[in-house]
Amino acid sequence: MTTLSFTVVHSRAEPHAAVPTIMLRLRVEEADGFSVHALALRCQIRIEPQRRRYSADEELRLYEMFGETTQWGDSLRPFLWTHVSTTVGKFDGSTEFDLPVECTYDFDVAGAKYLHGLADGDVPLLLLFSGTVFTRGDSGFAAEPLSWSLEASHKMPVAVWRGMMDLYYPNSGWIRVQRDTLDALQRFRAYRGLPTWDQAFEHLLKEAGEDGP
């Protein structure tokens, strides 16, 4: 049987994708001398928030996710960010490949909410691998499964996430609301003659007694 191991070389924002995408550069090694014909790879990516420190401002921004900091000993737990998959071509010994991770700016998604709450530093990631490895030997092709015991850690710079979002949503964010709520907001904006959504939200904040930008 093959013995594979994975490491994350680096991460970067992908500027030419159809949707916001972070590209993880991975290295895979086969330690038993088998020639790998192909690798069908699945990857579960988890965020491990307990593996980093937070500033006072970050603690406030993450209150909705984790509660008061006195509760963080219980609430700061790893959570799923996303699932991705890819294929790796033939290699002997080792090779490097890109793993594209499509991202969302939807703040109803835990991963996006957490990442938006970070000002700087790193995002602690854990990659859990599964899939199928295809090898070729004297008796022909063989296929064997990968187990979830294969994993790799990576400290992705927060700057990578922010740089990626700036590429696709420059100086802006994105929220999801129900259609009835959006219709009501459109009427509010039209009745008051507000030319932009920013001005509509600023007007609502002022009416609620909150400071605007």
Predicted regions and their residues:
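Extended, solvent-exposed segments with strong compositional bias
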Residues: R61-H116
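Low-complexity, acidic Ser/Thr/Pro/Gly-rich terminal tails and inter-domain linkers that flank the onset
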Residues: M1-M23
